[in-house]
Swiss-Prot record:
The keyword tRNA processing does not apply. Keywords: Ribonucleoprotein, Ribosomal protein. One of its GO terms (molecular function) is structural constituent of ribosome. Belongs to the bacterial ribosomal protein bL32 family. The keyword Secreted does not apply. InterPro entries: Ribosomal_bL32, Ribosomal_bL32_bact, Ribosomal_zn-bd. One of its GO terms (cellular component) is cytosolic large ribosomal subunit. Transmembrane segments: none annotated. One of its GO terms (biological process) is translation. It comes from Listeria monocytogenes serovar 1/2a (strain ATCC BAA-679 / EGD-e). This is Large ribosomal subunit protein bL32B.
Length: 57
């Protein structure tokens, strides 16, 4: 099995891993109360989705 001839430096390793990161969830402002909520989810603060009261009915 092949073995690296030279050790990979910290800089080289970190430059390679710049694209390895966590993705932030897609957040939107609620059109009713202005709080941030996940896309395509009911607002946890006011219970509305797509302009309709869903959670409190």
């Amino acid at each position: 099995m092949a073995v690296p001839f030279r050790r990979t430096s910290k800089a080289k390793k970190r430059k390679r891993r710049t694209h390895v990161k966590l993705q932030l969830p897609g957040m939107n402002e609620c059109s009713n109360c202005g709080e941030y909520r996940l896309s395509h989810h009911v607002c946890p603060e006011c219970g509305q989705y797509d302009g309709k009261d869903v959670a409190n009915s």
